[in-house]
Amino acid sequence: MYEFELINKYFSHLTKRSKSSLSLNEDVFFNKSNKLVVSVDTYVDGNHFINFKKPDLVIKKIIRSSISDLLCKSVKPKYYFLSGSGNSKVFNKNNLIKISKSLKEEQKKYNIILGGGDTVWSNKLSFTVTTIGFSNKIIYRNRSKLVRIYM
């Protein structure tokens, strides 16, 4: 079953009272009255990155991928929340220093701020990033007009 098929079949009915959820078809939550835009992404070792030998590069990839959900909606990201699950082998002192340094670089590059997060002990390495931005409007996927592009 494909992602949107799964969402439509099992979860979209849970959002019927909330226009802000956009029927779960836009990869973001958009509350017009508060100008609030939120997106959540999860990254799992073996699915979204091959290994964690270069944690600094993995962290940059997941931050950039996560903020791109807002950027493609024409929303400037402001805050992000980072949760990580892993064990002491991957979250050792050396890796944590590299992760912290990469996060600082990404924050400076994209003018974003870490708002919080969580850590969980697990044998399976994964990260979840929630991004938050503010905007009067967004670009909707399902309202985009198909245009031919020639290269």
Please report, for each region that a protein language model flagged, where it lies by residue.
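Glycine-rich anion-binding loops of enzyme active sites
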Residues: Y43, K76-M151
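N-terminal glycine-rich phosphate/pyrophosphate-binding loops that anchor nucleotide-derived ligands
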Residues: M1-L71, I112, F134-N136, R148-M151
